[in-house]
Amino acid sequence: MNKYKKAFLIDWKRYIVIMFSVVVIIGILLFQLGRLTGQANKAEVSVYKTNVSHRETVRNPINAPYYVVRNSIQKLIKPQNIVVPRFTSVLFAALVLFAFFSVLSLWYETRMLVLGTLLFASSSWFLHIARIGLPVSMQSLGIILVLLSAWLHQTKKLKLATLCLILSIGFLVYIPGMIWLILAAILWKGKALKKDFSGISKKFILFCICLISIIVTPLLWAVFKNPSVLFELTGFPNTLNIQHLLSNLYNIPIQIFIRATPNSISNIGNLPLLDVFTTAMFVIGVYATMQARKLDRSKLTFGLLFIGILFSTLVDSPLLPMMIVPVYLFAVSGVSFMLDEWFNVFPRNPLAKGIATTLISILVLSVAYYHITSYFIAWPNNTDTKSSFSERI
């Protein structure tokens, strides 16, 4: 009996719940991907006409991973269709979701793993990011660095973990905003990474250096030919407008928690990106994380939040893709804290524990239902959405 079969038999209930959740989430991500809005948005059409070949992508390498994947899929599906760019976004969003799920599996038990992933994946905020035919979903990929750095510290397969980390950094650097996360990770975990790399042969390290050099060469060449590419990568505007930046900074919490600016791409009317329950869990999660601020995971979550705020201040984006992961990490922390506090009050009462778990599960499912119906029913039938999504590819 191999080790995977043995692990499944020992903890089969956990795996069944996880597999069922995966099937449901895949269904949500792919449901009516091309037909929900009927036509495309102007921004989707503009991006669709950008970098239509790999040669053009080399000349303009911003968000290159998105365009390479999209163009490769387009070669397989000859008729021009809005499904192709949207499916490409879904693929990267699925990668974000996998990393989010994996990080939660390192930090929490099965109950919070399932509830936290469902809360994140069913969010209308996440669905708008994941299913729009724009490369915005890639800006949430910073959580991959969290996952890979944790894996590197724990695994015995140092070469494989190092290779995955190097490849990830090489591709993430093409995505606007990711350079801040990479630099922050190097400054914070540089000594720990050096210690991890000490167990790897110099030949393999040299190979990794050559590999990442090859991957980033098109980007370096593009920056050399056109220095403005660097501004786009970092988010720095060509002309600094302090008043505009302060306005962006002020609008971030307003848009997430209170009242969003009407935009058919990201929301219905002026509804905020978060619901009341998730907002409350976020506040509790910030408190809980502050209580455990010495833990690496607390520092990571606050670091992701800070860099998300920095980039979202520099760049106008109604979807705030770099904010969603840290916000939901705090929300999951809040849900976990609530359950832990309840369990501390009734440490030996299985009935009380069962009631608490059931109530929280019902709340999370209710929130998921609200967001799913909001995205799949209310949003596409909204007048502003219909007028905005009226372009043909």
Language-model segments: which ranges?
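Short helix- or helix-capping micro-motifs
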Residues: 25, 116-121, 169, 173
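Transmembrane-lumen/periplasm boundary regions of multi-pass, lipid-linked membrane glycan transferases
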Residues: 31-36, 46-56, 76-78, 178-284, ...
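Hydrophobic/aromatic-rich transmembrane helices and adjacent perimembrane loops
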Residues: 129-130, 136, 299-346
